[in-house]
Amino acid sequence: MKKILLTNDDGYHAKGIKALEQALEEMAEIYVVAPKHEKSACSQCITITAPLRAEKIKGKEGRHYRIDDGTPSDCVYLAINELFKHVCFDLVISGINLGSNMGEDTIYSGTVAGAIEGTIQGVPSIAISQILSNKNKNTPLSFDLAQKIIQDLVQNIFKNGYPLKGRKLLNVNVPNCSLQEYKGERITPKGYRLYKKEVHKRTDPKNESYFWLGLHPLEWQKRENEDRLSDFDAIASNHASITPLNLDLTSYDDLKSLESWHEGMLK
């Protein structure tokens, strides 16, 4: 039977990872290693200056752990190299995240980092995120669509193989709409996320200042010389976005011009 490792950055008790396990439990043998507490926007952080404690969850056949103060990268690293080192995983899936991970947000994302760590460890990996919307904030969030999308993706991977070669992963974002409103998947590049420069300053009861970061509206624009719809555009039209991500961050288009620039510096 196929074996899938699940993680997330919302924490072991988050609704998203429970929905993910529920969606896949009849398709594969499921293992879960997730942070004990929320670790959103922790990026690829891995713990090397403090010990990690792994708590085995009772009643889960020894396949569930939560990592005290661990990050998603910690969880995947520890799962593959120690907790389940005799298990050959077919997939690592990180999610279902509460909120989008599109454009440059993928660099900050703990959810995407969990899938990146799986890729680094040599396992085909997927990050999946559920878009939240202010207009639906008074409606209970449903993972029905995200569950269907991940089921279809995993089924296709098990049947036809993982679609990417090398150190690459799939990043999936699911629109906040019903199954009836859903228009299908789009293969997209990352969009260009627009960030504000605001910092929200507050004062506590002791009259000391504290700050909130990251409270930015979801705004974007097209990248230069890119005609294809981005992940943002797909979501805006009730499509899911599926974006291939590469761990190699080298800007190959700039290597020659950088060499020329450097030669000029040496003269």
UniProtKB/Swiss-Prot annotation:
It is found in: Cytoplasm. It catalyses: a ribonucleoside 5'-phosphate + H2O = a ribonucleoside + phosphate. Pfam families: SurE. A divalent metal cation binds at D9, D10, S40, N97. InterPro entries: SurE, SurE-like_Pase/nucleotidase, SurE-like_sf. GO terms for cellular component: cytoplasm. Binds 1 divalent metal cation per subunit. One of its GO terms (molecular function) is nucleotide binding. Its EC number is 3.1.3.5. Its cofactor is a divalent metal cation. Keywords: Cytoplasm, Hydrolase, Metal-binding, Nucleotide-binding. Belongs to the SurE nucleotidase family. Nucleotidase that shows phosphatase activity on nucleoside 5'-monophosphates. This is 5'-nucleotidase SurE. It comes from Helicobacter pylori (strain G27).
